[in-house]
């Protein structure tokens, strides 16, 4: 029977350490784009729902990623990423 080869590669960074670093990066980015009271309320919601658990950390990471993605996608004023509305003439004509 075939077996997967043993992992002899370089040691990876521990998952929890990587997760906390990712959360810190997301929080720093979120503070630049969203009002602090919103983020504070989100943190309170996550804490009341999950308590002080890794499941809560994963949930807030997922939510912050989704919020930032949508924020950039619909057009953040701080970024070049996103949809930029095109100005058009009457009846969609783009040339004069």
From Swiss-Prot:
The keyword Phosphoprotein applies. One of its GO terms (biological process) is symbiont entry into host cell. Pfam families: VPR. It is found in: Virion; Host nucleus; Host extracellular space. It comes from the Viruses. Coiled coil: none annotated. GO terms for cellular component: host cell; host cell nucleus; host extracellular space; virion component. Its main location: virion. Phosphorylated on several residues by host. These phosphorylations regulate VPR activity for the nuclear import of the HIV-1 pre-integration complex. During virus replication, may deplete host UNG protein, and incude G2-M cell cycle arrest. Acts by targeting specific host proteins for degradation by the 26S proteasome, through association with the cellular CUL4A-DDB1 E3 ligase complex by direct interaction with host VPRPB/DCAF-1. Cell cycle arrest reportedly occurs within hours of infection and is not blocked by antiviral agents, suggesting that it is initiated by the VPR carried into the virion. Additionally, VPR induces apoptosis in a cell cycle dependent manner suggesting that these two effects are mechanistically linked. HIV-1 lineages are divided in three main groups, M (for Major), O (for Outlier), and N (for New, or Non-M, Non-O). The vast majority of strains found worldwide belong to the group M. Group O seems to be endemic to and largely confined to Cameroon and neighboring countries in West Central Africa, where these viruses represent a small minority of HIV-1 strains. The group N is represented by a limited number of isolates from Cameroonian persons. The group M is further subdivided in 9 clades or subtypes (A to D, F to H, J and K). This is Protein Vpr. It comes from Human immunodeficiency virus type 1 group M subtype J (isolate SE9280). The lineage of its organism: Viruses, Riboviria, Pararnavirae, Artverviricota, Revtraviricetes. The gene is vpr.
């Amino acid at each position: 029977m075939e077996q997967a080869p043993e992992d002899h590669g370089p040691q990876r960074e521990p998952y929890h350490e990587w997760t906390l670093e990712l959360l810190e990066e997301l929080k720093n980015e979120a503070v630049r784009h969203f009002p602090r009271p919103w983020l504070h309320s989100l943190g309170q919601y996550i804490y009341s729902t999950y308590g002080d658990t890794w499941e809560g950390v994963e949930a807030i990471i997922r939510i912050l990623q989704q919020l930032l993605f949508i924020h950039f996608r619909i057009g953040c004023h701080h970024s070049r990423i996103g949809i930029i509305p095109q100005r058009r003439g009457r009846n969609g004509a783009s040339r004069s």
